[in-house]
Amino acid sequence: MIRLQAIRRSRVEKSDGKNAYWCVVSGSDLWLVDGQIPYGSAEQWDLPQEKAILVDRYQNSPVYWLNAADIEQDRPLTSLRELLGVDEALFLAASKAVQYGHMSQTIRFCPQCGGRNYLNHQQLAMQCHDCRTLHYPRIFPCIIVAVRKQQQILLAQHPRHRNGMYTVIAGFVEVGETLEQCVAREVLEETGIVVTNIRYFGSQPWAFPSSMMMAFLADYDTGELKPDYSELSDANWFGIENLPPVAPRGTIARALIEQTLADIAQDQA
């Protein structure tokens, strides 16, 4: 478990131009230099420091957010996924910048009255110029679950997955259901399997664009595996010795898979 330094804001904090991490974002993409978030001064990187907003700190250095549209010179943008291998605290800081950027780009107008929104200078939220309604970043709650059946783990492949990658079951939480109910429903709908012993594992913000992944472990109860091919390309039970390519390191899906395999290995010892 990582320890994040909390930032207490009474207002939006601007950059002083000193050495910092600079997250220049557009959608779920950001500017990387040699695969890393640029570090240094605003002057060094020719960035408009007056438009940079503090979103976090990493190793005692500030992490600033800038929208790519606010920079005169175009910078090559790369998916946030390219940072999955970096330290988790820095990845989460970059994720925060991406989500604030998404907020500023997608909540430009007030859904209450249609007025123009602007970035509120008391907190990181968009506010309507006319009716003054505050609009915070949208966060979509999702579950993700690793299901174990004796010495095997349930893994699924989605049509969007490349290189034959398999992962665990995931889905969005519906209105009026608990997280545990969502776990049971998603597994049943996508695979025909009924699960039991549902238990919390951890969470991960997932800025693609604005999800919060809440992870669970569960055990097989009953049912015959019948993949929903409108959602999945394949689903199957896999043992330690016959694993397919799985989700990359840095994802909570990979952490769930590794935990389940470790539990299986311990039981086999």
UniProtKB/Swiss-Prot annotation:
Domain of life, source organism: Bacteria
Annotated binding of Zn(2+), by residue: 110, 113, 128, 131
The Nudix hydrolase domain, residue ranges: 137-260
Cofactors that this protein relies on: Mg(2+); Mn(2+); Zn(2+)
List of residues binding a divalent metal cation 2: 186
Gene3D superfamilies in the record: 3.90.79.20, Nucleoside Triphosphate Pyrophosphohydrolase (3.90.79.10)
The reaction(s) this protein catalyses: a 5'-end NAD(+)-phospho-ribonucleoside in mRNA + H2O = a 5'-end phospho-adenosine-phospho-ribonucleoside in mRNA + beta-nicotinamide D-ribonucleotide + 2 H(+); NAD(+) + H2O = beta-nicotinamide D-ribonucleotide + AMP + 2 H(+); NADH + H2O = reduced beta-nicotinamide D-ribonucleotide + AMP + 2 H(+)
Positions annotated to bind a divalent metal cation 1: 170, 190, 231
Binding site residues for a divalent metal cation 3: 186, 190, 231
Enzyme class: hydrolase
Family matches, as HAMAP family: Nudix_NudC
Protein task: mRNA decapping enzyme that specifically removes the nicotinamide adenine dinucleotide (NAD) cap from a subset of mRNAs by hydrolyzing the diphosphate linkage to produce nicotinamide mononucleotide (NMN) and 5' monophosphate mRNA. The NAD-cap is present at the 5'-end of some mRNAs and stabilizes RNA against 5'-processing. Has preference for mRNAs with a 5'-end purine. Catalyzes the hydrolysis of a broad range of dinucleotide pyrophosphates.
NCBIfam families (alphabetical): PRK00241.1 (NF001299)
Family to which this protein belongs: Belongs to the Nudix hydrolase family. NudC subfamily.
Assembly notes: Homodimer.
Protein name per its UniProtKB record: NAD-capped RNA hydrolase NudC
Native organism: Vibrio cholerae serotype O1 (strain ATCC 39541 / Classical Ogawa 395 / O395)
Gene symbol of the encoding locus: nudC
